[in-house]
Amino acid sequence: MTMIFPKGFMFGTATAAYQIEGAVAEGGRTPSIWDTFSHTGHTLNGDTGDVADDFYHRWEDDLKLLRDLGVNAYRFSIGIPRVIPTPDGKPNQEGLDFYSRIVDRLLEYGIAPIVTLYHWDLPQYMASGDGREGGWLERETAYRIADYAGIVAKCLGDRVHTYTTLNEPWCSAHLSYGGTEHAPGLGAGPLAFRAAHHLNLAHGLMCEAVRAEAGAKPGLSVTLNLQICRGDADAVHRVDLIGNRVFLDPMLRGRYPDELFSITKGICDWGFVCDGDLDLIHQPIDVLGLNYYSTNLVKMSDRPQFPQSTEASTAPGASDVDWLPTAGPHTEMGWNIDPDALYETLVRLNDNYPGMPLVVTENGMACPDKVEVGTDGVKMVHDNDRIDYLRRHLEAVYRAIEEGTDVRGYFAWSLMDNFEWAFGYSKRFGLTYVDYESQERVKKDSFDWYRRFIADHSAR
């Protein structure tokens, strides 16, 4: 297949602040909920982001990797506790200056800065220790995060190409409050919907704040990790309502699906939705981001729905849905590889929400990467499986574009190996290998492959 992507198509890669920066007690930064979560035994091997990739001290060299890669965009997040370290909401100029330098260097390299405003590192002072109070369970959090977004937008202004309000709010609600996998790990099932609504509200308020401070030039976006399922149509529809349309519909249509209310009425009264909220949430955005890695296989079970269940669940309201093993091959995360589903999802989003440009904001593969040393002493990482994964998913994106879907960009996850949340440092997604002891960087074969792909398949 001869693929030439449209002129202006963004080829990029992505990272997140807590996963790479380290320096958690430097530059005025204070703890986030992930500092607390990782330091209290909730991650593999007790790993934390205390040092991570030490990007805070090595950012200049790491941005040179982007220049070498030949990308025209870089998606990164602002560490909220580095910018707003105290409950009084006063900005920390040292933190703002750090991100301002990054933006300026990217522009110097001809790389568009794509800024994620919230990538899970909620300041600990906004939440109680166990997560049962504060955080995204409280309406006030949405307003405080919007204030922070305005501070960032005032500082970075229209130097930023696109401001993304939220990264994967499904994780921030369903994994963090419904389940126990992510900070704060509350495990209270239906409270995921309360958190989801406040995240939706924050999205709308952040959009308003960014426009007020940065003007109309920068784009506005939100990034969702949709729960893409195959199998029983009724089960697929149920998961779609609970995990996808709970965000998509209020953001893009200004309403929650009536069916969502009906299937959750036994576990959630939705009384936290106030008059005027949906108007605030339903803000015009310029692009919808999609993080895509794999699919699920589901079917309706024979057991009845448990309408009063308040147990830990990442899919509250779907206790009568069975999650089945998926066919291989699988990545190191245990996720199946299904590039056709990326194509199908892009087309479906284009059909269901017409006129909304799309960007694949994350896509990548965890592999069991090993460093080899050649006879000339040069270190290498041969990751052919990752190359095949990236190639097949880029082909899926191109197929969607050729059939009329408006896809504006693709971001490989990730620029370099990093702290993989609850999995600690056990999973490697990077195009660049990181030795966490020495902090040495080694470009993997996939780095060079992606560089060549961008050069060969970009419109001149």
Curated annotation (Swiss-Prot):
GO terms for cellular component: cytosol; extracellular region. InterPro entries: Glyco_hydro_1 (IPR001360), Glyco_hydro_1_AS (IPR018120), Glyco_hydro_1_beta-glucosidase (IPR017736), Glyco_hydro_1_N_CS (IPR033132), Glycoside_hydrolase_SF (IPR017853). Inhibited by Cu(2+), Ag(+) and Hg(+), but not by other cations such as Mg(2+), Ca(2+), Mn(2+) and Co(2+). Inhibited by 1-amino-1-deoxy-D-glucose and p-chloromercuribenzoic acid, but not by EDTA or dithiothreitol. Inhibited by the disaccharides sucrose, lactose and cellobiose. The monosaccharides D-fructose, D-mannose, D-xylose and D-glucose increase the beta-D-fucosidase activity, but not the beta-D-glucosidase activity. D-glucose inhibits the beta-D-glucosidase activity, but promotes the beta-D-fucosidase activity. Keywords: Carbohydrate metabolism, Cellulose degradation, Glycosidase, Hydrolase, Polysaccharide degradation, Secreted. The active site is at E168 (proton donor), E362 (nucleophile). It comes from the Bacteria. It is found in: Secreted. Optimum pH is 5.5 with pNP-beta-D-glucoside as a substrate. Retains more than 90% of its activity between pH 5.0 and 7.0. Retains 70% of its activity at pH 4.5 and 8.5. GO terms for molecular function: beta-D-fucosidase activity; beta-glucosidase activity. Pfam families: Glyco_hydro_1. GO terms for biological process: cellulose catabolic process. Its EC number is 3.2.1.21, 3.2.1.38. Optimum temperature is 45 degrees Celsius with pNP-beta-D-glucoside as a substrate. Retains 60% of its activity after 10 minutes incubation at 50 degrees Celsius. It catalyses: Hydrolysis of terminal, non-reducing beta-D-glucosyl residues with release of beta-D-glucose; Hydrolysis of terminal non-reducing beta-D-fucose residues in beta-D-fucosides. Its main location: secreted. It is an enzyme of class 3 (hydrolase). Monomer. Bifunctional beta-D-glucosidase/beta-D-fucosidase. Activity towards pNP-beta-D-fucoside is about 80-85% of the activity towards pNP-beta-D-glucoside. Also has slight activity (less than 10%) towards pNP-beta-D-galactoside, and very low activity (less than 1%) towards pNP-beta-D-xyloside. Hydrolyzes laminaribiose, sophorose, cellobiose and gentobiose. Not active against maltose, pNP-alpha-D-glucoside or pNP-beta-L-fucoside. Belongs to the glycosyl hydrolase 1 family. This is Bifunctional beta-D-glucosidase/beta-D-fucosidase. It comes from Bifidobacterium breve.
